[in-house]
Each structure stands twice: as structure tokens, then as C-alpha cells.
């Protein structure tokens, strides 16, 4: 199916690109989320008339994401979890825990934005975590997991 991208889609293309994708991907994901439209002649003409407006909107979204990333970059986030004597946690620190800690500090992030390269954190110490705010913008923070002794 031929579609017009209404925003940048990772591994697919930029705003305004006409690309061919599988029917299911277009019908079930891209079109319902507003990331694409069917590439009919009428849709292409409508897109071209609104192109400048859409590009400005995307630029504003990118600028807002860069501003949020500048605030988040290098942040040291502390999370306390029960741990044994050897520094191994009872349970783990997941992206939901990191989301809650960031919201407590006043940052609005969604759980799906948090990328943990080694999976959930199961050891006391400092761990690098990436927050992907936009397809082009990522902020790197350090999550410091503190062990809480169990009596």
C-alpha cells in the first residue's frame, strides 16, 4: 500500500515521503495513529497544500523535545529498593519505577520513552539509562540504585 508519511517514522522515512508498506502495517498501525495517510491523488494534493504548516508543527515538537532533553541530560536519579548484603536487589528497578521517580521530580515522561540497555536493574549502583523524547532526541541520565537493608 502506498502511503504519505505525516511525521518522521523510524526506519521508514521523513515527513511527506511517499512509501510502500505492507497493508496490515498501514491499516493497523500507521494510519490509526495519524502517522500516515493513503497516497491517493487527492491526499497528495491536500498534503502539499498543508506541507509548510505540518513542517512547522514538527519543528515545534522537535524544539520542545530538545528543551526537555537539555533539562534531563546528565540528571542523577536516585531510586531506593530493598537489597541483600551482596548488593543484589530483592526484585528489580523497572522503567515504571524510573517513570515514577522522574514524575516526582517534575518531569513528564512515559514508560515507553525509557530505554534500559541491560534490561531492568537488579544490582545496587549507578546505571546509565536513555530517555527517548523524540525520534531524533534522546537524553542520557544516571539512575543510582540505593540498597535499603532488610531487618
Curated annotation (Swiss-Prot):
Record keywords: Ribonucleoprotein, Ribosomal protein, RNA-binding, rRNA-binding
Cystine pairs: none
One GO CC annotation: ribosome
Keyword Ribosomal protein included in the entry's annotation: yes
GO terms for biological process, alphabetical: translation
Keyword Ribonucleoprotein in record: yes
Pfam families in UniProt: Ribosomal_L9_C, Ribosomal_L9_N
PROSITE patterns, per the entry: RIBOSOMAL_L9 (PS00651)
Listed InterPro entries: Ribosomal_bL9, Ribosomal_bL9/RNase_H1_N, Ribosomal_bL9_bac/chp, Ribosomal_bL9_C, Ribosomal_bL9_C_sf, Ribosomal_bL9_N, Ribosomal_bL9_N_sf
GO terms, molecular function: rRNA binding; structural constituent of ribosome
Signal peptide segment: none
NCBIfam families from the UniProt entry: L9
Family named by the database record: Belongs to the bacterial ribosomal protein bL9 family.
Functional summary from the UniProt entry: Binds to the 23S rRNA.
Protein's name according to its UniProt entry: Large ribosomal subunit protein bL9
Source organism of the structure: Nitrosospira multiformis (strain ATCC 25196 / NCIMB 11849 / C 71)
Amino acid at each position: 500500500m502506498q502511503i504519505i508519511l505525516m511525521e518522521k517514522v523510524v526506519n521508514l522515512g521523513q515527513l511527506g515521503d511517499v512509501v510502500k508498506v505492507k497493508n496490515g502495517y498501514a491499516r493497523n498501525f500507521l494510519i490509526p495513529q495519524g502517522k500516515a495517510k493513503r497516497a491517493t491523488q487527492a491526499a497528495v494534493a491536500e498534503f502539499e497544500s498543508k506541507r509548510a504548516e505540518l513542517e512547522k508543527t514538527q519543528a515545534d515538537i522537535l524544539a520542545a523535545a530538545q528543551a526537555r532533553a537539555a533539562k534531563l541530560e546528565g540528571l542523577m536519579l536516585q531510586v531506593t529498593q530493598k537489597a541483600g548484603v551482596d548488593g543484589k536487589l530483592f526484585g528489580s528497578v523497572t522503567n515504571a519505577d524510573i517513570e515514577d521517580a522522574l514524575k516526582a521530580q517534575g518531569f513528564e515522561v512515559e514508560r515507553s520513552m525509557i530505554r534500559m540497555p541491560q534490561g531492568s536493574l537488579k544490582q545496587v549502583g549507578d546505571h546509565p539509562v536513555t530517555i527517548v523524547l523524540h525520534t531524533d532526541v534522546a537524553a542520557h541520565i544516571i539512575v543510582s540504585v540505593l540498597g535499603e537493608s532488610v531487618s
